[in-house]
Amino acid sequence: FINNNKQMKKNVIAIILARGGSKTIKNKNLKKINNKPLIGWTIDQCKRSKFISQIWLSSDSQSILNYGIKKKINIIKRPLKFATDKASSESAWMHAVKHLEEKKIKFDTIVAPQATSPIRGKSDFDDAIKVFFSKKYDSLFSCSVIKDFFVWKKIKKRLIPNYNYRNRKPRQLIDPLLLEN
């Protein structure tokens, strides 16, 4: 990405996390959606970006890593401790960053697309990268707006609403919630 104000070249890379041990949908990252593995959609979208210079795939699954090799992207073998149900995405990203630093891979900015959110427009990555640099943000994420819903959460066997139950607004007047994609 070239920032027109400073003529400074930015090295933007993508780190895609795709673990193999999903318990909900077995091998979900390799399940075909419209004749393409789920992970393939995100890889191809990153490849179409004008600004992403390198794509790195982090996984504990050799099958997923082999797919990355087939797609001609860089791979990082993720240790199992960063690939459990309880491991955070942040711990896996930090492992990937450490791997890149050890390999002396230079980058300024990381795009961290979710493989499980494959429905993106052709220019979504590039549009987001442009906004990120032009607004001088330190981070940026996409989200979906949830409107017209009463949301509850369960805390120690109690249900807690997202509204004041003594003054329940009509659903049309509820402030929208933002759900990170």
Protein language model annotation of sequence segments:
Residues 1-10, 70-72, 102, 130, ...:
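Asparagine-rich low-complexity intrinsically disordered tracts
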Residues 8-26:
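N-terminal nucleotide-binding beta1-loop-alpha1 segment
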Residues 12-13, 53, 108, 138-140:
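Conserved acidic residues
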Residues 19, 80, 114, 144-145:
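Histidine-centered beta-alpha loop that forms part of the nucleotide-sugar donor binding/catalytic region
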Residues 38-54, 66-67:
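A short, N-terminal amphipathic alpha-helix
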Residues 55-59, 142-143:
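Short internal beta-strands
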Residues 56, 62-111, 119-123, 127:
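Short phosphate-binding loop-to-helix
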Residues 91, 95, 109, 115-181:
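Conserved core of the sugar-phosphate nucleotidyltransferase
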